[in-house]
């Protein structure tokens, strides 16, 4: 019975992983499109980094990166 369950569960895990991967790729493409539209309005102002969009330099909004202070 254990082997039979493993044979059933494995394809489900592979399918779920594939769906999640495809969704994240599509989301990234959507964000890129939004950034491009915003850059048409205000060039070089909007950036995407780590799944977020904002009016910051892309390195500053990534975790683990210290943003340089403006004087």
UniProtKB/Swiss-Prot annotation:
Signal peptide feature range = 1-21
Q: Which UniProt keywords apply?
A: Amidation, Disulfide bond, Ion channel impairing toxin, Neurotoxin, Secreted, Signal, Toxin
Membrane-spanning residues where? none
Tissue expression profile of the protein: Expressed by the venom duct.
Q: Identify the GO cellular component terms for this protein.
A: extracellular region
Q: Where in the cell is it found?
A: Secreted
Please report the propeptide residues according to the UniProt annotation: 22-44
* Tagged with keyword Transport: no
UniProt superkingdom: Eukaryota
Which residues are annotated with the PTM Arginine amide?
70
PTM summary: Contains 3 disulfide bonds. They are not indicated here, since framework IV presents two different connectivities (I-V, II-III, IV-VI and I-III, II-V, IV-VI).
* Domain remarks in the Swiss-Prot or TrEMBL record: The cysteine framework is IV (CC-C-C-C-C).
The family assignment reads:
Belongs to the conotoxin A superfamily.
**What's the protein called, per UniProt?**
Conotoxin Bu25
- The organism named in the record is Conus bullatus
């Amino acid at each position: 019975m254990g082997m039979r369950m493993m044979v059933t569960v494995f394809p489900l895990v592979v399918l779920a992983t594939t769906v999640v991967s495809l969704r994240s790729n599509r989301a990234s493409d959507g964000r890129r499109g939004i950034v491009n539209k915003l850059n048409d309005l205000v060039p070089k102002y909007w950036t995407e980094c780590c799944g977020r969009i904002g009016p910051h330099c892309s390195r500053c909004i990534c975790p683990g990166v210290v943003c340089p202070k403006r004087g």
